[in-house]
Amino acid sequence: MALRHRFRAPAARTSLALALLAALPALADASGAPAAQPSTLDTVVVTASGFEQKITDAPASISVITREDLARRPYMTLLDAVRDLEGVDVGETRDKTGQGTISMRGMGADYTLILVNGRRQNNHGDIYPNNFGGNQFNHIPPLDAIERIEVIRGPMSTLYGADAMGGVINIITRRTLDSWHGSASIARTVETDDAFGDDSTVDFFVTGPLLPGVLNLSARGSWYERKASNPTYAPATDPAGGLHTRPLGFGSGSKTVDNTNKAGGITLAWMPSDNQTLSLDYDTSRQTYDNRIRINDSGVEEYPVGTVDTINSIWRASNYCSGASGANAAACRANGGTWARRADPRVGYSASQAFTRDAWALTHEGQWDIGNSFVSLARVATNNDGRTLPFTVAERERLLAMIDGTGAYAGMALAERRALAESTFLPRPKRTLESAQYTLDAKLDMPFQAAGEHTLVVGTQVIRGDLTDGVFGTEKGTPGLKQEHDMYSLFVEDNWKVSTPLTLTAGLRYDDHKVFGDHLSPRLYGVYALGEQWTIKGGVSTGFKTPKTTDLYDGVIGFGGQGTLPFFGNPDLKPETSTSTELAVYWQHPRGHNFNATLFHNRFEDKIDSQPCGAGLALRCTSSGEYAELGYSSSNRTVNIDEVVIQGAELAGRWQISDAFGLRANYTFTDSEQKSGAEKGLPLGNSARHMANATFDWQASDRLSLFLTAEARSRRYRGVSAVTGKELYYKDYTVLHLGASFEATGWLTFNARINNLLDRDFTTYQTTFTDLNGNGIYGDVTNEVLFEDDYNNKDKARSVWLSMNLRF
């Protein structure tokens, strides 16, 4: 018997939507005004080839998000900017802080390269262990500082190197100006359900000359705040009338804590001549999360993002079978093992979590007779503050003696032993998690004539970085070691206009990594113009991703089970690689209509994953060190395992119905299959197989525009049934948003949007009751009551977003 805990009448939702749509004409002049022109296929981009080109001419699948687009929607993280693009999925998962990730063409977040003005922002190692990875997408420039965002779908390692396997997101900020201008925005999202917390944002940007024509300044800043959310599941009633209350978790479970994200930056631009610019940029970002212990509605202590270190969390011990398998002492000894005992202290988090990033860049841009040059030296330093060190082997052995009252602690009272343990082991030492890297980029694009027009791009990249993780070395009893990351690259790419309609792009990149050696990344792409309205383009691109610095460490690289179970790295890992083929057709009409369709096929090899290791298994835990003494010779270790094929289609277009009305929409089909490894035949990750977005916009008057947006997702993979072995999928859904923008004056604009217009409930679930022992009582035997969520993420209920933008 299955029971859904809540029912919402779809008829009521539909009536509300129709009523709102019917009311729209009353808000505008009957005459209607020309619609604001959206970005078109003629938009100029730079990310696809390293120099300026139209979207239709660019050798890649690329989309552009303009500053005007960003101002019309709620904006807290990078996910808010890209969520409605074809090929982009921001709904795969949520981390412990409730932050999401960005996946492109079925590749996970680790395969998306983030750039700011062409400079890489990705960390070379994992400083967000234990499911905090969404925070990497929060270290972004303030809204008012962004000029546009260019998004490339598909591998781009020829130009950008490692990490660009799934795609590239290049955030391009506003340039300094020789006259004083600026803008400021303030916004708030008000929730209609008080179980969810409100969002507040403030942004500003200002630029102008310090020395006219010689030295310009720009400054930017933002302050984003998100209040805690504490939704609850409705209870389920079993056939006997008993109520079963199910707790919601943090992160993907929709519960979140208070958090703030503050960012600021400054740029100085010196123009010694009309064709030379030297700029110095500094940027800082601070995210904080409240992790204080709290009591939930059931009266139970809970830790929002991780176990806070207390005497109660460390005062734990258990029995285990050493050298064999066995659930109890008799079975263990019968299998030749030794029944033993060990301490299992749960630690790893302080009462506040903070994620910081500081970056600077010195950049020279020059225009020469032979072409244009770009040289940049940048440093990015990221810090995860608020983690604490798990217990070493020696500490665990001493703690066990205190718990059991043995050795030096024999005869001591329990309270005395607990007090001694608290003073000895608490507070825990800080677990340093710091990543820093210097990146030198140099590039020259040179136009020339030779059997047609050419634009040759040549360049180099040098990366020198290091990562410190407090757990490195714990297998030796010396925590706090450092891992280095050194890589050198050369690349060349030629954009050859063979004839008026045909352009070929060929490129090659050579990378030399300190650990695994060299790697070549070629690509070949063609663009053919079938007249003024039609363009066909396609090609083959390659991508590669170096193993994370953390994964390459030969020893303990992290802990699971709240600091109890060590995980191990592997210095013999190979880079992950991919080869992607795509074919696309583009059409544009002088009246503003446009359409594009793309087919893509991506072969992904040497995927890195974590697999069980230990005695009796094919994979040995060769770097467990001292932890083997406590029976941790069986755990998990990183290895290259899988080959995956991902293929699909992307459709996008705009229909300019009239001067006042327009409809733009896109659709993405993604199909993936793992060709090898333990999950052969199954999809990779849980990207939605079908994604669709549509926006109907109406320029009601010169000052007022309105729009209705729909987001649809279906067939999101959730795993395999343990009973039937069949693939399982989350429930399909469609969400509507209704928005408006009103330009009160030439310098003041108001924006508003109703998010989740029909108030879809994402906390619904299915319950299966089975009376296994036949006593008519459900829940007194394991697996008599089983819960299954309808949705992988518990998105918020209906809310109202309001913003005001001031320009000067």
Map each language-model feature to its residues.
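Extracytoplasmic beta-strand/coil segments of soluble accessory domains associated
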Residues: 47, 79, 83-123
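C-terminal beta-signal and adjacent terminal beta-strands/loops
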Residues: 124, 603-605, 712-719, 741-808
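Transmembrane beta-barrel wall of Gram-negative outer-membrane proteins
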Residues: 195-292, 321-322, 356-363, 450
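Membrane-embedded beta-barrel scaffold of Gram-negative outer-membrane proteins
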Residues: 186, 363-365, 374-386, 529, ...
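A beta-strand signature from Gram-negative outer-membrane beta-barrel systems
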Residues: 138-185, 807
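Gram-negative outer-membrane beta-barrel transporters
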Residues: 185, 497-499, 600-603, 622-721, ...
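Short acidic/polar hinge/loop motifs at secondary-structure boundaries
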Residues: 121-153, 204
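Face-selective signature of the C-terminal outer-membrane beta-barrel domain
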Residues: 269-286, 331-516, 529-531, 596-599, ...
